[in-house]
Amino acid sequence: MTRNGIGIRTAQVRSERLTGQIHVYDGVGKGKSQAALGVVLRSIGLGINAPNNSNRVLLLRFLKGPERDYDEDGAIAALQRGFPHLIDQVRTGRAEFFGPEEITTFDRSEAGRGWDVAKGAIASGLYSVVVLDEINPVLDLGLLSVDEVVGTLKSKPQELEIIATGRGAPQKLLDIADLHSEMKPLHHPKATELLMTGIEIYTGAGKGKSTSALGKALQAIGRGINHPGSTRVLIMQWLKGGSGYTEDAAISALRQSYPEVVDHQRCGRDAIVWRNSRQELDYVEAERGWEIAKVAIASGLYKTIILDELNPTVDLELLPVEPIVQALLRKPRDTEIIITGRCQNQPAYFDLASIHSEVYCHKHYANQGVELKRGVDF
């Protein structure tokens, strides 16, 4: 029997894997640091009540000096306020873009300082996840020795997860990576013509779509920390009526720490939906989810709305496209919409996206038979 369509699988795990993986998110598209923050949130979600801070995370940010504000600053502030005992942050570098011809002694010194912190953290055994944010361009610029970094990562403690982000990942790093997702930007001239802003789409077969969306949710929460009532987030999920999905721990962590800010709804059967095995309940559940989303978009109550797995829902023809287009065209200007999920045929609302990243899967450890790990994969 031929099966056409897209199914959303729950995470399957036979036992807790003992070997931590090396993740690389690169490419020129948006979503790399956001995806890393999503993984951080998953790990923290499982570590809230864990003994001995066993899910502690280090977020080490290269090329991001303290003199400038970055997109993810609000997200990190939300993490540190909600889970101060589970996350450490170190920032290095100067707060401006520079090319190879503009490298200074300070740049090399700051890269070395950051790498010294990284080596100590990796060897310490204190962390379950170490994020090396923007280490890829640091290596590409020659500020650190690729061979030294690769050698250290290859000899890391067995259970430690490493996440490396940024453009220009060197081939030697990609060779040892267990997961490699590349963010490729796609541009939609119609969105520019219509002056559309605040619609982001993450699609493709690579890992990092829903996690990027969760990073955006964290950013929204962080922006509203000092302005109670100014920020509210809705996470609306389709095709996810069961449990054990990759982002469950992350959403649970958000709702536990920010219950008055985060709303979460999901719809669908606890089953994989194929095009040739759709049931009446699939249509009913998809429409139920859209009614919730449509009202939320029009209300102006939410500043960030995540429409998780809307793309495959439309691709499976469980929802019509035109009502979605019209709702997005009429959204409040200060409402951000993040839409996720792979699809075979791009629906018309893609033309309204001001940011669209195709997450391309070069390598994924799950395809090599590696068991999934709670707090990283789900």
UniProtKB/Swiss-Prot annotation:
Pfam families: CobA_CobO_BtuR (PF02572). One of its GO terms (molecular function) is ATP binding. GO terms for biological process: cobalamin biosynthetic process. It comes from the Bacteria. NCBIfam families: PRK07413.1. This is Uncharacterized protein all2391. It comes from Nostoc sp. (strain PCC 7120 / SAG 25.82 / UTEX 2576).
